[in-house]
Amino acid sequence: MKKIICLLLILSFAASLISCDTLFSASNTINGEYLSDFAIVYSDEDLDYSFRAAEYIQSEILNRTGLDLPLIEDSKNPVCEFEIVVGNTNRAISKKLDAETEGLEFAILADGGSIALEADYFIIAAAAYFFVETYVLEMDYDATIPEEVSIHTPIVKKARNYILLIGDGMGINQTKMFEYLENDVEYGDGEDIFYGYYLPYHGYSRTASLSGVTDSAAGGTALSCGHKTINGLIGRDKNNKDIKSLTELAYEKGMAGGVMSTESKVGATPSSFSAHADGRYESAEIILSQANARDTYGTIIDCGYDYYTQRYVSTVIERHITDTLSKLEQNENGFFLMYEEAHIDKHCHNNNLNLAFQAIVRFNQAIGRFMEYVFYHPDTFILITADHETGDLYPNANGKLEYHSTDHTGNNVPVFAYGDGAELFDGKTVENIQIAHTIAHFMGDNNFGDQSNFTYLGK
């Protein structure tokens, strides 16, 4: 009999815990309405950015409160009494929101039983993260969202992840192609702007090597190792001695490292971040050095996907980006990753404006996915630049873009930065090696590379 009574007491106690947990979840409210009564709505006519933002909100609410809110498409479901509306939908609240935002700004509005989040392209990810961090807590709460349009900027935290995006051959006018060409590229977002211009901090970089106008080997080595070197050398200084790369520095700091490119892994730029060789065409030497990097440093080298169709850009390339980031983020100390779009350079060598534009749009797609990651992981610094300009591209007398060379030039290239410390690059024209110096400084090394003439920014 005593055993039965004890068992009943245990079951009663367990039931009380379950009921308390249920009460805990049910007592979470937004503007006085139970969070459990809301559905999350996304636009099936909008870009995938909005769908992924809606998924993120759903997942975070489940993780934080135990509530599994329904995720529904805008056009296929009637209006619910209480909704969290993500992106540009046909819901009345979306039309009411319709805010004028600039750069990385996003808008939030509460109206009646609905809440709406709105932003351009990938910036909706920043809105989703802000919404969850601000209004979805892990305890009993009653959050209040203003019933008037509020404009916000993304949350930024101290950086522990570093992403360097390189558009090979991408000069200033390559990023301006959207002003001259119609974007009917099938795998694009229909965008009319290079995504770097959404970032708040812009500057320029000088690209000369010790040989004069740089090639991709010396240009890549400058960005990877913080040394000016001789054309053709991979990860080596002017005396042909191996020099430390940011990828290797990451390993020293206990971080993960990765190298990605649409070029093959023995291409000059990915090689500069993953190998040491006395010639950019020494493929056997480069492959052996990269094998050592994988074995010694655990460097992820994922290269060689030159696709120009919706199917492959939206699945293969974007999946590779997602998978690589997922592997790198497993390191609790953070990571360094370089990603290169290699084919802007190749098409500019051939003076093929349309194919170069397709490569720029493809680079934009990669930038969008990386920026999504940054917004969901605000402890990430990101910088977009080029190793050099190719083709001497600028408008002719009739206002049309025109090539004036088939080779590399000494033209300055753009720098776009976002995240903790990114303001150091704003409005400045820097040497390419200073980009490496400054990222290394952020990673905790103030003596990285050759700083005899130029140092990290902020010193």
PLM region spans:
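Positively charged n-region of N-terminal signal peptides that target proteins for export
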Residues: 1-4
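Functional beta-strand-loop-alpha-helix junction segments that form "active/interaction loops"
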Residues: 68-72, 237, 306-322
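N-terminal catalytic scaffold of extracellular/periplasmic and nuclease hydrolases
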Residues: 147, 153-305, 309, 364, ...
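Hydrophobic core
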Residues: 9-13, 17
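Active-site His/acidic residue clusters
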Residues: 267-275, 308, 312, 321-325, ...
